[in-house]
Structure formats: structure tokens, C-alpha cells
Amino acid sequence: MKPLFISATGTGVGKSYTTQKLLQSLHQSGRKPLALKPIETGANPTPEDALLHLQLMQKLQLDQGLSLEEICLERYKLPASPWVSAKKEGRCVDVDHLLRRLLEFQKRSDPLLIEGAGGLLVPLLKEYFMIDLAEALEAHMVLVISGKLGGINEALLSLEALQHRQMSYTLVLNLWEEEKRSFEEISAPYWKERPERLFRLDSELEELTQTLLSAI
């Protein structure tokens, strides 16, 4: 079973929230998923997103005794890209270690949810990006998009990167409350004409979950 890699068109779009909703939905469908945030920046000192995933897994009795250090394999203080944050600390992201550990977790997950940091082209190394990590894992991408003005452009740039690498993906719309009314007017008409299905996280979670299970 392939892992699900949760990315987004940018920071603050809703990757962590989407990961948590998918974790709950998969659990309700009888699966035993794990959710990791292998790299987190802005962790000064606690990786807050990873902690939320661990707490939810503990609540659902899915954590398998994992520690926060296993949920978040690399953490950095500066809220920036992993490459910049690691460089500031005189460190370097250990991609080989990340891949090795994630493949190990994949074997004990049903399925494994991996939350990325930022968007697809966030650098882990100078010439190695978040999308490269997902591709190396042969993951199915869950791309969370925004309903704000400008969201279409951001989404299409991310889709172009995925399609260039011939990676499989599913689109998920995470609407903040203040975006719901404007989305129907400024963005929904375009997405209705696209060939891809755009799943709304607030109303189509169960169908999204079954679609993702079929994809992996």
C-alpha cells in the first residue's frame, strides 16, 4: 500500500487539519493509519503539528507507542524552509535517514499519512525538494488547495509540477469560514470545468477517504 503524502499550495492552507481529518476518517473506516510530520520548522522547542498528530493517535489508540521524536524525525527552530532552517543551525537535512525511517513506518501503517512542510517545491536541500521526497516514496499526493483569491494560480502551478513527474494525486479543498461565500463566485466556476475531481473537506470527507484508499 502506497503512503499518502499531504501537501498544499502553500503554508497555512490546511495540511495539518486535513491530515487530522483523514486520520479520523480512516480510523472510522476500520483502518489503522499512522500520521507523521517528518520535518517541522518553527519548532521552538516543540513541533506543534507533530504533537497534534501524536495526541490524536493516542486518543484513537493508533500511536503504537511512538514518541514525538519518531513522529517528527527532524525539527528546526527557524520558521523557514528546512534547508534554510537547517543551515542556520549548522545542520543538513538527512534525506537518506528520512527515507529509510519512512519506509519502515510504511510497513506498520494502514496506511501511512505523511504531512509535508510548506508546498511541493520547498527545499530540503539546495537542489532537493519536498516533491522529491514524495516521489522517492512513490506516494500518492493529497494536494490541499485554498479557496482564496489567487488560489487557482497557486493550485495550477502545483499541478504542473505533479503532472511533469507523472505523480498520482487527489485534490482537496479546505475552505476557511471567511472563504466559503467568495469561493462559490470567484473559484468554483473554474474548478467545475476541470477534469479532476475537487473534494471538499467539509462535506465530502467519507467519499474522499474511499477514493484515496482505492488509489493506493
UniProtKB/Swiss-Prot annotation:
Q: Which UniProt keywords apply?
A: ATP-binding, Biotin biosynthesis, Cytoplasm, Ligase, Magnesium, Metal-binding, Nucleotide-binding
Q: Which cofactor does it need?
A: Mg(2+)
Q: Where is the active site?
A: K37
Q: Name one GO biological process term.
A: biotin biosynthetic process
Q: What is its EC number?
A: 6.3.3.3
Q: Which family does it belong to?
A: Belongs to the dethiobiotin synthetase family.
User: What the protein does?
Assistant: Catalyzes a mechanistically unusual reaction, the ATP-dependent insertion of CO2 between the N7 and N8 nitrogen atoms of 7,8-diaminopelargonic acid (DAPA, also called 7,8-diammoniononanoate) to form a ureido ring.
Q: Subunit structure, per the record?
A: Homodimer.
What is the official name of this protein in its record?
ATP-dependent dethiobiotin synthetase BioD
**UniProt source species:** Wolinella succinogenes (strain ATCC 29543 / DSM 1740 / CCUG 13145 / JCM 31913 / LMG 7466 / NCTC 11488 / FDC 602W) (Vibrio succinogenes)
Read off the lineage from the record: Bacteria, Pseudomonadati, Campylobacterota, Epsilonproteobacteria, Campylobacterales
